[in-house]
Amino acid sequence: MGAASGSAVCIANVLNNCMRYDNLDVIEDGYGINLLPLALFASQTYENAERFRPKSVSIDSYSSKDIDLLSKMHKAICIIQFKLEGQLIARHPEFNMGDRDLLSQINFKDMTITIDGTEHYLLDTEFPTVDPEEPTKLTSEEEKLMKKLVHAFMNSEKLQKHIHFLLTSGSMYLCFNDNLLFHGCVPLNEDGSLMEFKLNNALFKGKELFDHCDKIVRRAFSTDQNSSKKAYGQDFLWFLWCGRNSPLFGRDHITTFERYFIAAPETHNEQKNAYYQYYSEEKFCIELLKEFGITNKNAKIVNGHIPVRVRNGEGPLKANGKLVVIDGGFCKAYQSVTGIAGYTMFFSSHGIRISAHQPWCGLEESLKDNTDISSETVIRDNFPERILVGSTDTGKILKENIEELEALLTAYRTGVLPQIYKK
């Protein structure tokens, strides 16, 4: 969404992720975005990019030259990403992320960086576009490249159509039929209290935080192109993606830089928000539902974002059935971790049903062996009493419509509203 709004830093993050996990066909074929300028810039700028070899690239699909070019493109956009993130962090001290401008913390004399008091040697020391005096400043070539990419993303008709659908149909959270749905987490302090965020010179937490985030996101698309509100909304979309304890991210920080440049595995750890220490407790889930105005005894929280590690014995139901985790789905990078290809939750008048899916074997094998995605119902949780239409959100709307129609009919019958007859 941030990329579609024209945010250069979000575009860099999108391209970084697509290259890392070999999803560039989505960008080029799906959305018709031309990456030739990036390829030309990368091939002319970088020599060594072995550390940026795509994580899940298929050797059968690419030649060694293709992989070499992809690696250089990957490195080029990563360096641009780190520069733009450093600039954004400097613009917004209220995000409390000054320690995450890692490019500015590199000691370019001996090519080391100190994190949490420990000095680490960098695994890649080639930085032809980085000025040690101004590490986050883009070169003129990088600026030209990003202008082209911003124009391409903003003028992709299909991408804009898809993001418009998300804006008009989606939200930060949804209360539906006494269920609370959200993607990441409701940020908490270590003691379990709601974490406060200072945004626009005001403090927000819990439901108020989600409501305010929703407003800021929409400003990134609905205001004038060069307005300060739009610029803040674009930066805030990046914060939601990977900002400290963001409700959509739910971690202290993202370790993209460390995974590329530092060997020590302890630096790759992304500490989760305290929410994940409490979301298995039934009492906490009941209180969280109340925070969003839901008190029904059958209410559930439907929580995304965190993969369910089935191979380690984890399951999608937590807190005595008050919370359902539905995530870690069709993303190939997670399937080796989870052991499955995600879950689907079905909600009906009888209760909920959760199906687990096995990874897709691929088009060739499907056609050869006439196989499909294998799914199995793993959980059934029936309600004590069947839910009738009148008790659902749709039923409540129908009741309101009936009351309005009856009031209108009464107004006509009593003469409050005169009927007009056409001759």
Which residues fall in each region the model found?
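Feature recognizes metal-dependent phosphohydrolase scaffolds
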Residues: 1-423
